[in-house]
From Swiss-Prot:
Species in which this protein is naturally found: Streptococcus pyogenes serotype M4 (strain MGAS10750)
Gene name, Swiss-Prot/TrEMBL: pyrB
Chain sites annotated for binding L-aspartate: K87, R172, R224
Binding site for carbamoyl phosphate: R59, T60, R109, H139, Q142, A265, P266
EC number: 2.1.3.2
Organismal lineage: Bacteria, Bacillati, Bacillota, Bacilli, Lactobacillales
Similarity section: Belongs to the aspartate/ornithine carbamoyltransferase superfamily. ATCase family.
Keyword line: Pyrimidine biosynthesis, Transferase
Subunit structure: Heterododecamer (2C3:3R2) of six catalytic PyrB chains organized as two trimers (C3), and six regulatory PyrI chains organized as three dimers (R2).
Pathway participation: Pyrimidine metabolism; UMP biosynthesis via de novo pathway; (S)-dihydroorotate from bicarbonate: step 2/3
Reaction(s) catalysed by this chain's protein: carbamoyl phosphate + L-aspartate = N-carbamoyl-L-aspartate + phosphate + H(+)
Annotated GO CC locations: cytosol
Name under which the protein is recorded: Aspartate carbamoyltransferase catalytic subunit
Record GO terms (molecular function): amino acid binding; aspartate carbamoyltransferase activity
Length: 311
């Protein structure tokens, strides 16, 4: 990975740890340029991309598709339910097939953690891999759009007090964000049910009760309660979770005037956040969705830069 002619060039994008700080900031800046309409878009019709989603998705899937179409790529139709996956074909063989057909980029979401390792290590698969989310592992494109949203607001990361709240153990968003925000100099706090907290997170921030820190926060990043990963073993109701850990009207009133609220969505209204606050003045949830298109344009461009450099 490198920066060529002031533009990021990537072979794959599978995790935030694999990016240098220069590459992270370069992608954020490029996303901002796309958003401002400052980029003259080249003709990429000859470049083929396949979005291989094996978990349900609205924002990530459609955001990538919009980004790809804005860049002029040819987007191959893929429906996992109508593919050979239903005949028992493995992810590896699906990607191997797409690569053999001449696909340049595969954007993949899959329930298995680290699914991408055998793909990027394969000597036969020539398609570049973009991780659209792997199980409870990583979600690099969501992390980058979150960073753009924060940077638009504050113009910096250094010294910001940021709390990541909720279903921490099961959240790929949390894992990607805590790693890079720590590296960029933010002061991180975590809160949520203790059974959803891992001591491994202590390397990045401090576990604390929300009511002890809420008045000092610059960013409150709420996480979706991932019911599908709990096997029905939650120890509390939606109402009790909201009162203990959610953003209630009372907690909202305690936030600084300059503070912002974020959530990767989909939102469980009246669980992580009061229904009336999803579009409140401090909320940036809709901005995150919009920024996703521009950051993903920057990601796809960076992959194409990397492929052109290596060809």
């Amino acid at each position: 990975m490198s920066v060529v002619n002031n533009r990021v060039a990537l072979t794959n994008l599978v995790s935030m740890e694999a990016l240098t700080t220069e590459e992270v900031l370069g992608l954020i800046n490029r996303g901002s340029e796309y958003k401002a309409g400052k980029v003259v878009i080249s003709d990429h019709q000859k470049d083929l991309v396949a979005n291989l989603f094996f978990e349900n998705s609205t924002r990530t899937h459609k955001s990538f598709e919009v980004a790809e179409k804005k860049l002029g790529l040819t987007v191959l139709d893929f429906n996992a339910d109508a593919s050979a996956v239903n005949k028992g074909e493995s992810l590896y063989d699906t990607v191997l097939t797409m690569s053999a057909l001449g696909t340049d980029i595969c954007v993949i979401r899959h329930p298995e953690d680290d699914y991408y390792k055998e793909l990027v290590e394969s000597p036969t698969i020539t398609a570049s891999i973009v991780n659209g989310g792997d199980g409870s592992g990583q979600h690099p494109s969501q992390c980058l759009l979150d960073l753009l949203t924060i940077y638009e607001e504050f113009g910096r990361f250094e010294g910001l007090k940021i709390a990541i709240a909720g279903d921490l153990t099961h959240s790929r968003v949390a894992k990607s964000n805590m790693q890079i925000l720590k590296r960029l100099g933010a002061e991180l706090y975590f809160y949520g049910p203790e059974e959803w907290y891992s001591e491994a997170f202590n390397a990045y921030g401090t576990y604390i009760a929300i009511d002890q820190i809420i008045k000092e926060l610059d960013v409150l990043m709420l996480l979706r309660v991932q019911h599908e990963r709990h096997d029905g073993h939650q120890s509390f109701s939606k109402e009790s979770y909201h009162q203990a850990f959610g953003l209630t009207q009372e907690r909202y009133q305690q936030l600084k005037d300059s503070a912002i609220i974020m959530h990767p969505a989909p939102v469980n209204r009246d669980v992580e956040i009061a229904d009336s606050l999803v579009e409140a003045p401090k909320a940036r949830i809709v901005s995150q969705m919009a920024n996703g298109v521009f950051v993903r344009m920057a990601i796809i461009e960076a992959i194409l830069n990397g492929r052109n450099k290596n060809s």
